[in-house]
């Protein structure tokens, strides 16, 4: 999508299908606040953007390209685990977009796969029972984009509450200007900065 008008039209289309602002924000890789702002169509009266859309469709359409990104993420995970002198037990994918990276990381390293789904109303999320548990494991959390850090914060809290130890968060792109969330280091392949 190239323009705010296109983003607006896509957001309205999703809203009309019954999606919540949180679900729309996940799909469009925008913060919830930006989606609310977009749906209010206030951008017509404003001159400067308040958010950056991160699109990675060129990589996402082929498994081999996702695999290449996963290899970079694994390399980052191994670098950090060596610095911290600990073993990684599992890779956790945040639904939907973190799952392909965590799946490939699990496959390529022989570590366990955990799937986590955050609850759209900001309550506790849940771990899929079809995959590994977090209990007594050093967990690397993976997602595509971190915008406000809210989903990552809740994921970290839920891993801790469920008996796991979140040791690292890795994303393709971060919109944050911080290096950790809730005491857990966050690494990104790319960072965005508004100038």
Swiss-Prot record:
<comment type="similarity">
    <text>Belongs to the purine/pyrimidine phosphoribosyltransferase family. GfcR subfamily.</text>
</comment>
<dbReference type="GO" id="GO:0010468">
    <property type="term" value="P:regulation of gene expression"/>
</dbReference>
<dbReference type="InterPro" id="IPR029057">
    <property type="entry name" value="PRTase-like"/>
</dbReference>
<keyword id="KW-0238">DNA-binding</keyword>
<keyword id="KW-0805">Transcription regulation</keyword>
<dbReference type="InterPro" id="IPR000836">
    <property type="entry name" value="PRibTrfase_dom"/>
</dbReference>
<dbReference type="Pfam" id="PF00156">
    <property type="entry name" value="Pribosyltran"/>
</dbReference>
<keyword id="KW-0804">Transcription</keyword>
<dbReference type="InterPro" id="IPR022854">
    <property type="entry name" value="GfcR-like"/>
</dbReference>
<dbReference type="GO" id="GO:0003677">
    <property type="term" value="F:DNA binding"/>
</dbReference>
<protein>
    <recommendedName>
        <fullName>Transcriptional regulator GfcR</fullName>
    </recommendedName>
</protein>
């Amino acid at each position: 999508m190239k323009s705010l008008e296109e983003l607006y039209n896509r957001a309205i289309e999703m809203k009309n299908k019954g999606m919540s602002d949180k679900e729309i924000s996940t799909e469009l890789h925008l913060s919830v606040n930006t989606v609310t702002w977009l749906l209010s169509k206030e951008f017509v009266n404003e001159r400067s953007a308040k958010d950056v859309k991160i699109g990675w469709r060129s990589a996402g359409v082929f498994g081999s390209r996702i695999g290449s990104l996963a290899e970079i993420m694994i390399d980052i995970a191994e670098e950090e685990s060596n610095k911290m002198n600990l073993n990684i037990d599992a890779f956790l994918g945040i639904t939907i977009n973190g799952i392909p990276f965590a799946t490939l990381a699990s496959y390529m390293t022989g570590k366990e796969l955990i799937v986590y789904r955050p609850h759209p109303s900001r309550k506790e999320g849940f771990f899929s029972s079809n995959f590994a548990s977090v209990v007594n494991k050093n967990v690397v959390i993976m997602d595509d984009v971190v915008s406000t850090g809210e989903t990552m914060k809740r994921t970290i809290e839920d891993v801790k509450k469920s008996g796991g130890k979140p040791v690292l968060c890795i994303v393709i792109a971060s919109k944050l200007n911080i290096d950790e969330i809730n005491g857990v280091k966050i690494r990104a392949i790319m960072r965005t900065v508004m100038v």
